Amino acid sequence: MTAPIVTTFDITRPNDDAENLHFTLNVKNNTSKMLELRFPDGQTHDFVVKDFAGKEIWRWSKGRMFTSAMRSETLKGKEDTIYEESWSSKGQHGSFTAVAILRSNNFPVETTVQFVLP
């Protein structure tokens, strides 16, 4: 059986930018039918960075306000949606784990990528 939702999580460093990392979570409807992603509030996604010991050092949503109303997004068959955010890694060195979270009630996703900052 094919999974209805397929995700990819990428971390890139924009050209000529030594301090910022760009996080991209691509969420694809892997079916030919329309899918509705349901969210408990206005926050659809989140990105987290943890250090080597697993301590959280950055969370995109920290300090942000989101509506309390439930919301939904519809994806047509084979359609995708992209969630993107950036993090300033200034002064950070070592091994890290980034976590991308799709906060959908009906298709929740949490995926990780490990990376090193010299």
Residue ranges and their predicted role:
Residues 11-13:
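Extracytoplasmic/periplasm-facing segments of secreted or lipoprotein envelope proteins
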Residues 88-118:
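Terminal connector regions
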Residues 3-7, 16, 21-83, 97-104:
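Contiguous segments within soluble domain cores/interaction surfaces
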